[in-house]
C-alpha cells in the first residue's frame, strides 16, 4: 500500500491489515469494501453473548441496533414484523442500545431484565414507556450481555439509530427507505436516522 499526502511531501509505504476480517488488504477495492462493511462473523460475533431480540427464522442474518425511544427504529421494527416474506427469508437480531440519552439507558435495561418473549419485548418497545413499565421484571438480572452489546456498538461506530448490518456486511446508518431493496443489495435511497442529541 502506498499513500501520498496531499502536498506530495510525505509518502507512507507498507502493509494494511484488517483486524476484523483477519486479512491483509492489498488493493484499493479491498480497502473501500472493508471500510463500508462490518464483518461480524470474523469479529467473533455470537448472538448469545449479547443482549438481542430475534424476529424471523430465515437463513440470512441481519443485525440491527435500535434505541427504545427512536421513532425510525419503531417504524423499521413494525415493517419487519408485518412482512411474512422478510420473516421467512431473514433472521433479524435487534440489539437495544441507549443512543438517545439517559432515559433510553433505563428502558434498554428494563427490556433486558423483563420476562417475556423477544417479540413481546419488541412490541412493548413499540407501544412506549407505559407498556415497557408493565413488563414483569426478572428476580435477578446479570447485565453482562447488555454491557457487551453497548461495547460492541461503540467498537463498530454506532452513532445514530437504527444502524442496520445486512447479511453481506453492508451498513445502513439510518432506516433504509426500502428495507427489502437494501437487504438485496440494491442502490439505497436516503436513510432516516435518529442521532444522539448534541450537548
Regions found by a protein language model. Give the residues of each.
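N-terminal targeting signals for export/organelle localization
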Residues: 1-41, 196-199
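C-terminal cap of thioredoxin/glutaredoxin-like
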Residues: 1-13, 128-199
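Glycine-rich loops and low-complexity Gly/Arg-rich segments
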Residues: 19-20, 27-30, 37-39, 87-91, ...
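A broad, low-specificity signal for short, low-complexity segments enriched in glycine/proline
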Residues: 22-27, 52-56, 122-127
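Short coil/turn linker and secondary-structure boundary residues
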Residues: 23-26, 116-117, 144, 174-177
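A short beta-strand-turn-helix
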Residues: 40-61, 82
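Structural alpha/beta surface segment adjacent to cysteine/selenocysteine redox centers
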Residues: 59-142, 154-159, 184, 193-197
Amino acid at each position: 500500500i502506498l499513500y501520498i499526502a496531499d502536498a506530495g511531501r510525505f509518502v507512507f509505504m507498507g502493509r494494511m491489515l484488517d483486524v476484523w476480517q483477519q486479512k491483509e488488504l492489498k488493493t484499493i477495492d479491498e480497502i473501500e469494501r472493508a471500510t463500508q462493511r462490518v464483518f461480524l462473523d470474523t469479529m467473533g460475533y455470537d448472538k448469545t453473548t449479547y443482549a438481542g431480540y430475534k424476529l424471523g427464522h430465515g437463513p440470512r442474518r441481519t443485525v440491527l441496533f435500535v434505541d427504545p425511544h427512536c421513532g425510525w427504529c419503531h417504524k423499521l421494527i413494525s415493517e419487519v414484523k408485518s412482512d411474512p416474506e422478510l420473516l421467512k427469508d431473514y433472521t433479524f437480531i435487534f440489539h437495544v442500545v441507549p443512543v438517545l440519552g439517559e432515559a433510553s439507558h433505563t428502558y434498554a435495561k428494563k427490556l433486558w431484565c423483563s420476562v417475556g418473549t423477544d417479540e413481546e419485548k419488541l412490541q412493548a418497545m413499540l407501544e412506549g414507556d407505559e407498556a415497557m413499565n408493565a413488563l414483569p421484571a426478572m428476580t435477578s438480572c446479570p447485565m453482562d450481555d447488555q454491557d457487551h452489546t453497548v461495547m460492541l456498538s461503540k467498537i463498530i461506530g454506532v452513532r445514530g439509530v437504527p444502524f442496520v448490518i445486512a447479511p453481506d456486511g453492508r451498513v445502513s446508518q439510518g432506516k433504509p427507505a426500502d428495507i427489502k431493496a437494501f437487504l438485496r443489495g440494491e442502490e439505497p435511497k436516503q436513510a432516516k436516522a435518529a442521532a444522539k442529541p448534541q450537548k
